[in-house]
């Protein structure tokens, strides 16, 4: 009979006992708020250099923006790997395996730091070549290289924050990372203003501010874990990599990370097609993207909740609760997504006017919102179903199907369909088509695997 796991900290959540319906939003909404805050704080970098760097403001804004694809690829890859940490610890907590929890926590910390250094070193060496390959204008390149090199210096602590956040999420504590991010984000904004306005720096100022604020947030989470209960307590003496646990983390996390990286590449290809349509279209698409990502953060947070709840209950052998988690996640996420989309569409033109006063840009941006949101139900469904499968440790299948359904379809669409009808709407149709196809593929995989039945015998035998 599975043991009941007790968690001491009030921020933590008992996922394997009691009602599920009221705990899912308590887990998911802080995750959504954290992601939205990250978007806002990242935007502050551009806002500060765009307003306070004098003659260099145009090049500075372009330099920060030009680094987004590179930084996005790196972060998406390692955030995916951190998901493996979340699942492994959640499974171990569910089966009351304190030893595995401890090994996973300490392995994750070193994985983040070592991974950061392994990427940082070649990144520093080849920064010029990487950014030059992206056809960045000559007047922007020096600023872009400066920003990237400073950012890479802080990559180990930036990755550490994401891995430590995954540890907290695995026990249901999504509030602590949110509070720490909110405080460090405010510090980031203040440092941006200090370095750029007072010290007259440009992109180097906002890059240094980003590194410092991330370092502080990582240190705070590190200290909190050192003072935590025995389940996820961190000890400097115990810092070592457990090869078996690392293998399990990578088995789940690496496919998710590669999926996110390939996802980013497909979006770069779409962005290139958008860029070919001129300045107005680029401005409209960029403004709309900054709005629609908020809705994505909301429904994706329920996917993370589903993964963690399923992970713990699978570890505890409570497969009926796993299935119930899936159904409740879909139901509650549908409501949350519908409310978010409704609010965004109702105020869409006003929100777009924050970014631009050009009526043509606003209308094109609203067109993008309508087409993207028409398929967000499908996106929500495949994210939840993928999260459910990952909770059982099935990570490669949703990663492959998402790569085929989303990335493959979009690349095909841009290179085959778009040339015959090179309009903004043609590009945007790639989103509902790819998202709906992926939802169907993941649903078929869910029916084929049927984890709650497939693992029933294995759990009973343990």
Which functions belong to the PLM regions below?
Residues 79-82, 151-169, 177-188, 206-221, ...:
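Short runs within selected transmembrane alpha-helices of multi-pass transporters and secretion channels
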Residues 61-121, 158-177, 284-348, 379-402, ...:
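Small-residue-rich hydrophobic transmembrane alpha-helices
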